[in-house]
Amino acid sequence: VPVPTRLVNVVAIQRGTERPNEVVIIQAHIDSRASDVMNATIDAPGANDDASGTALVLEAARVLSQRTFPTTVVYAALSGEEQGLLGGRLLADYAKEQGWTVKAVLNNDIVGGSTGSDGYRDDAHVRVLSEGPRADATDALRAQMRRFGGENDSPSRNISRWVAKLAEADTEKGLAVRQIWRADRMGRGGDQLPFSDKGYPAVRFTVAVEDYEHQHQDLRTEGGVKFGDTVDEMDFPYLAKVVRLNVAALMAIANAPPPLP
C-alpha cells in the first residue's frame, strides 16, 4: 500500500452463552485486484476471489445468528488480503490482544467456481489446505515434535481431517474434501496464514480446480479468451454446497465441549 490508508474489516461477533472467550472464526476477504496489484484505479471485479467467500460468510451469519452457541462465533469480511494479508493480520492481532481461545479459523477464499483453465469441471470436491510443522523449524523444535508428536498432527491438520470426515458422512451434500497438506497453494497465500503464525488452528477452503484466466486479471479478451473475475463464471450450486459444509462444520465446532483439563 503506497500511501497511508485506513484499513477496515467488517466483523460481527455472536457471543457464546457459556464460554464467550472460546472463539470460532469464519472469514473471507472483501478486496480484489487486477493484473497489477498496485493499480488502484482500473476496474477489478472479484466475483470468485473473493465475493464468493464473502457471500458464504454472510449466509452463514444469516443462518447461524438465529441460534445460540456455548462458544463465540466471529463472522469476518477482511480487507487488504491482496496487498499482503493485512486484514487477516489485523484480526489475528486482535484475537491475541483479547486473549481469545481460538478453536478454529475457517478461511474461505475462491470457493465459487467449478471449472478450471483447461475446461475441466469438478463440482464434487473442495480443497482444504492446512499447515503442518514449519519447514524452518529449529533443531530443538524438531526434536520436541519427534518426542511429543507434531510431525503430521498439527491442530490445523486435524481440523482438515475432521472436515473431510464430516463431508464424507453427509452424502446428500454431494461434496467431498480433497485435503492438501500445505499452508496454501504454490506461491500463494491467504488470510488463514496470520492465524497459523500465531499458533491458532486455521484452514483454507478453496475450489478443486484453478481458473487462472478468471483471477487476478484485467478485464479483456485475448485470442478469443475472456479474462477477468466476473460473475458469469460462477457456479452458484457449487458455492451453495461449500456454504453448507462450512455451516455444518461451524455449528459442530461452536457446540463442542472444551477439552478435558
Q: Language-model features: where?
A:
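Active-site-adjacent mobile loop/cap segments within catalytic or ligand-binding domains
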Residues: 113-129, 180-257
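Short, solvent-exposed loop/turn and secondary-structure capping segments
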Residues: 22-24, 35-40, 85-89, 116-120, ...
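Soluble metallo-hydrolase cores and metallopeptidase-like ectodomains found primarily
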Residues: 1-43, 62, 66
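Second-shell loop/turn segments in exported
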Residues: 1, 38-50, 63, 77-78, ...
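Extracellular/periplasmic catalytic domains that process cell-envelope and extracellular macromolecules
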Residues: 2-6, 15-20, 67-70, 84, ...
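Metal-dependent peptidase/peptidase-like ectodomains
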Residues: 78-193, 198, 202
